[in-house]
């Protein structure tokens, strides 16, 4: 039985011996320090294999048909094929030195589209990076190499790709700004003006000599020969399960996506006149390029994935989709907009309950973000300048979107995401130190008097370039959010784009990263001072955002999301997630996706949206209800945080081993103390159960203290509020007012932070805060007050008012009926009394 294999082995040995003779042919000497080919000597050994599979050997009429033989073990993916080994036949041409000139010798011309120098290094002996190609089995296991040419290896370009008449693709408005003499910083080796990190109109003029460092790109599949280009930067995204790296050069991008939970994907972008070369056993004249669409007017895109062989494979569809991205637009804003839109669609799909697997969004979103950085790098190369606002925009979007896609699409832990990019801002350390100095020098009280757009510029830079919370920035953020809260609870705030962005950046700048509780303290400060201050202020911000997330605001915010999703269904919109940012997205309310709140949202959707939201695939009611659930579900996402803010800022909830039931609301009301609202009673804390609430949706309020793992039950007592107007002391400060419905829906949670809010609480019908005005209550609404010491009291004033409130129509009808009854009674009495007085009965008797 071993005879065929013995013959095959002898044939392989003879072939190798013949190949050794060919190596004696004079070839250019290996440059010093180049190559790692100690295996190519006269003592080459072949290990004996019991089973060897040998593929077809192609002859080459134009060159010597001698091939070098490498034998490697492999696990066959074909069913019923035994474990064995493969014989790889590498063309002799791969032994020759590269045919192209060194890339460093041809520096790019400023602003010249022909500037990119991208070369494919097809060589073994003269290749410093040969080792991965000899040791890796990825080229087999991922099936990127075809044995024969297959249909679909080179596929048609997308309809959204650029054309010869429009080579740059879609360009958004407004047009890109031009450099200004007053705000331009030149990188020409001379004295430089200090970089103003908060002035969005600052322009950086690039020194192209800084981009002459070469990048050697090596395919992670070990399926494409190394590619050399001028390096411009690197973008990294990832978490504990996924890593995404984009290597960027002049006219070049190599994107690698690898994940524990999902198949890998690689995308390579080169100039349209460059041909990358794939490793296969074809002779040089038949050597394939990697798979991808046909070349475009500027670039050529290759894509490698697990689905290259299977046209109906999910990865095949994803590969063809992302391959179109680099050629859709050179405007980085276009790609950031679509990355934001895909993120919204991902959150909506998860919230609607239609799907729990949204991993395909990972490829789409991270590819968009990578292409955005590539597009910006190319625009910088072609224009020789960069606007500071472009750098901040890219970095801010990376920090906003990456944690969401890593958590929901890649399956990573909530606090394991990371991202960085040196494409837009290669002076990150300079920017970080400058923003820290600017913030340390500001006067918070004076800063508060500035307009909101200046707050946005400052906090935006802090959010983008400070990886730790800065004391003054946290204090400023807290004061700004408090000012918004004062207006929001009175329904006097206008949630325009500036207000939404200020709120988002304030929350993000205050929170920083979740490591703030263990960061080194500021110089000269006690070890615990900064951490306790940051914790206290962030707890207060959580509470204020929760209080701003009233039922009416949640409905209006949900309606805004409905309109965005209606536009998505109707044909697509381009936007930023910050355009729909809401206090609810930074709050500790987890109940907005419940049925009651969804129905509240659906009740106010304008009729014009019903046509847009109806896709025709479902019944109208089902479709509308699904979008309502999606909108409210998105409000439940805390997109301002790249970590689990509740667990970090409310450690008392995890101080005991007892696991809490599903939480509706968390109220960090005092240091190390929080109220938690649930549907079922937890086995920890002081617990209250509300009476008169739908038994299917009960409301349970628990007061949890850090380290106290005992459980006790208490009864909510009714009471009237004492009017504290005669004293300057704030009696109810630190308390939370809750308005709820007998159906079990929580309407409002108003935090009483000062005397002004306290006086509005007892003002009755004259209150300027709608939640405190009993005239706006219906018989199905009640209110209670949660004190910071753990006492909960039912507000009798609001309950009694609602109990005796009757419609005016019923009242007037009752009065009319009463008057009519009195009139009828009067007539009867008049008749009786009149007959007796006039002796009518006597006359009647006499007559008889």
Curated annotation (Swiss-Prot):
InterPro entries: Herpes_gH (IPR003493), Herpes_glycoH_C (IPR035305), Herpes_glycoH_C_sf (IPR038172). The chain crosses the membrane at residues 809-829. Keywords: Fusion of virus membrane with host cell membrane, Fusion of virus membrane with host membrane, Glycoprotein, Host cell membrane, Host endosome, Host membrane, Membrane, Sialic acid, Signal, Transmembrane, Transmembrane helix, Viral envelope protein, Viral penetration into host cytoplasm, Virion, Virus entry into host cell. GO terms for biological process: fusion of virus membrane with host plasma membrane; symbiont entry into host cell. Glycans are attached at residues 36, 41, 45, 60, 119, 182, 210, 496, 672, 766, 789. It holds the Pfam family Herpes_glycop_H. Residues 166-191 are annotated as: Disordered. Residues 25-808 are virion surface. It is found in: Virion membrane; Host cell membrane; Host endosome membrane. Residues 1-24 form the signal peptide. Residues 240-303 are annotated as: Interaction with gL. It is a single-pass type I membrane protein. It comes from the Viruses. N-glycosylated, O-glycosylated, and sialylated. One of its GO terms (cellular component) is virion membrane. Residues 830-848 are intravirion. Belongs to the herpesviridae glycoprotein H family. Interacts with glycoprotein L (gL); this interaction is necessary for the correct processing and cell surface expression of gH. The heterodimer gH/gL seems to interact with gB trimers during fusion. The heterodimer glycoprotein H-glycoprotein L is required for the fusion of viral and plasma membranes leading to virus entry into the host cell. Following initial binding to host receptor, membrane fusion is mediated by the fusion machinery composed of gB and the heterodimer gH/gL. May also be involved in the fusion between the virion envelope and the outer nuclear membrane during virion morphogenesis. This is Envelope glycoprotein H. The lineage of its organism: Viruses, Duplodnaviria, Heunggongvirae, Peploviricota, Herviviricetes. The gene is gH.
């Amino acid at each position: 039985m071993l005879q065929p294999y013995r013959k095959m082995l002898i044939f392989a040995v003879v072939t190798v011996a013949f190949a050794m003779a060919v190596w004696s042919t004079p070839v250019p000497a290996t440059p010093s320090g180049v190559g790692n080919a100690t295996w190519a000597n006269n003592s080459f050994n072949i290990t004996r294999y019991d089973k060897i599979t040998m593929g077809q050997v192609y002859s080459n009429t134009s060159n010597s048909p001698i091939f070098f033989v490498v034998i490697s073990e492999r696990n066959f993916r074909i069913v019923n094929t035994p474990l064995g080994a493969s014989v790889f036949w590498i063309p002799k041409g791969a032994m020759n030195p590269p045919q192209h000139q060194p890339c460093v010798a041809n520096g790019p011309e400023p602003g010249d589209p022909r500037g990119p120098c991208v070369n494919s290094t097809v060589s073994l002996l003269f290749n410093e990076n040969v080792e991965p190609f000899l040791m890796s089995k990825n080229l087999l296991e991922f099936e990127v190499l075809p044995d024969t040419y297959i249909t679909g290896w080179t596929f048609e370009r997308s309809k959204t790709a650029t054309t010869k008449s429009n080579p740059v693709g879609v360009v958004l408005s407004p047009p890109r700004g031009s450099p200004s003499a007053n705000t331009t910083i030149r990188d020409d080796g001379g004295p430089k003006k200090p970089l103003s990190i908060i002035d969005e109109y600052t322009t950086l003029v690039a020194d192209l000599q800084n981009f002459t460092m070469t990048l050697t790109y090596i395919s992670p599949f070990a399926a494409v020969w190394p590619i050399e280009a001028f390096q411009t930067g690197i973008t990294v995204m990832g978490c504990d399960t996924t890593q995404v790296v984009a290597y960027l050069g002049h006219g070049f991008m190599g994107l690698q996506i690898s994940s524990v939970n999902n198949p890998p994907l690689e995308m390579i972008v080169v100039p349209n006149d460059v041909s990358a070369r794939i490793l296969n056993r074809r002779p040089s004249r038949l050597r394939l390029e990697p798979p991808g669409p046909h070349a475009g007017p500027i670039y050529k895109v290759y894509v490698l994935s697990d689905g290259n062989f299977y046209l109906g494979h999910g990865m095949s569809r994803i590969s063809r989709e992302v391959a179109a991205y680099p050629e859709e637009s050179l405007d980085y804003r276009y790609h950031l907009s679509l990355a934001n839109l895909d993120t919204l669609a991902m959150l909506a799909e998860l919230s609607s309950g239609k799907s729990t697997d949204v991993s395909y969004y990972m490829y789409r979103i991270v590819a968009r973000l990578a292409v955005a950085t590539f597009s910006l790098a190319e625009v910088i190369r072609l224009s020789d300048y960069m606007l500071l606002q472009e750098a901040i925009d890219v970095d801010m979007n990376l920090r906003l979107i990456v944690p969401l896609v890593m958590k929901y699409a890649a399956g990573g832990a909530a606090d394991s995401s990371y991202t960085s990019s040196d494409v837009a801002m290669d002076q990150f350390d300079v920017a970080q130190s400058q923003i820290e100095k600017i913030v340390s020098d500001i006067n918070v009280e004076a800063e508060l008097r500035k307009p909101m757009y200046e707050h946005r510029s400052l906090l935006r830079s802090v959010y983008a370039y400070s990886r730790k919370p800065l004391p003054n920035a946290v204090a400023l953020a807290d004061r700004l959010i408090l000012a918004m809260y004062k207006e929001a609870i009175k329904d006097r705030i206008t949630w325009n784009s500036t207000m939404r962005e200020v709120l988002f950046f304030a929350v993000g700048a205050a929170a920083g990263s979740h490591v703030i509780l263990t960061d080194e303290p500021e110089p000269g400060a006690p070890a615990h001072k900064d951490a306790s201050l940051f914790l206290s202020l962030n707890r207060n911000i959580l509470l204020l955002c929760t209080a701003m997330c009233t039922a009416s605001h949640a409905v209006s915010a949900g309606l805004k999301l409905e309109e965005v999703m209606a536009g998505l269904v109707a044909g697509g919109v381009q936007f930023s997630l910050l355009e729909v940012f809401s206090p609810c997205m930074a709050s500790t309310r987890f109940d907005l996706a419940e049925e009651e709140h969804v129905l509240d949202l659906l009740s106010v959707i304008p009729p014009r949206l019903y046509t847009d939201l109806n896709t025709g695939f479902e019944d109208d009611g089902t479709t509308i209800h699904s979008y309502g659930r999606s909108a409210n579900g998105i409000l439940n996402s805390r997109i301002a945080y790249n970590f689990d803010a509740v667990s970090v800022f409310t450690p008392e909830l995890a101080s005991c081993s007892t696991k809490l039931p599903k939480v509706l609301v968390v109220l960090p009301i005092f240091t190390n103390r929080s109220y938690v609202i649930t549907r079922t009673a937890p086995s920890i804390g002081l617990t209250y159960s509300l009476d008169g609430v739908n038994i299917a949706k009960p409301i349970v309020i628990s007061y949890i203290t850090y380290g106290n793992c005992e459980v006790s039950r208490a009864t909510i007592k009714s009471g009237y509020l004492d009017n504290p107007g005669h004293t300057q002391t704030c009696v109810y400060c630190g308390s939370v007012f809750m308005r709820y419905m007998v159906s079990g829906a929580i309407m409002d949670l108003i935090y009483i932070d000062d005397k002004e809010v306290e006086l509005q609480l007892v003002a009755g019908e004259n209150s300027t805060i709608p939640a405190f005005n009993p005239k706006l209550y219906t018989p199905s609404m009640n209110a209670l007050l949660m004190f910071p010491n753990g006492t909960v009291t039912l507000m009798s004033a609001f309950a009694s008012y609602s109990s005796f409130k009757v419609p005016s129509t019923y009242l007037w009808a009752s009065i009319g009926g009463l008057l009519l009854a009195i009139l009828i009674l009067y007539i009867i009495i008049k008749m009786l009394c009149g007959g007796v007085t006039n002796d009518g009965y006597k006359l009647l008797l006499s007559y008889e």
